[in-house]
């Protein structure tokens, strides 16, 4: 009798956070104000979402209006680590940067990864059911035994696949609702659907880094920052 074994999964954490309408409205207005005060609008291309980290607003975790949100995110990060059986007591966790994104009409976010951090989050502060969904892309493609098999438009058009599922796909379209939080490795390539109409979709992104509390016997992990020495350049 045949058996199929699936190894090396990508684990994405999803949870719904509890925020009052007043809290959410205050954060939404704060994000809209940031958009009005953009410092780098030449960087924003047509049909691309507004991203606060490129406009001078990359430290939402230090903004008191977002305090409760980041407290809840903190707790969810610890739950994520528990699911991977990571002893977080041996690690120092830092919010490295955090920002808002605004998608209007057919604006989208190109596929990308956050290579300067370890974990990333996406929280949906304002989202309608029909707004664009997040997509995750598989850069390993362990099952793609023929080069370009999974991503070829011509092969898909020729019905080379009887059906598409997680075993033979190089991307996943993942549905979320307002108040949902996602946590995933920062190296994961992700973006949003293109050509979808958005009713001012507002999400909060954040990057998290991990440092060893004590690196005295460790070959890997980033050592404690208090032992670093800054260059005089």
Enumerate the predicted regions with their spans.
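Catalytic core of non-heme Fe(II) oxygenases with the double-stranded beta-helix
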Residues: 103-181, 214-220
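Residues at beta-strand starts and edge strands
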Residues: 9-11, 96, 117-119, 200-202
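A structural signal for short, well-ordered beta-strand segments
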Residues: 98-100, 121-123, 204-208
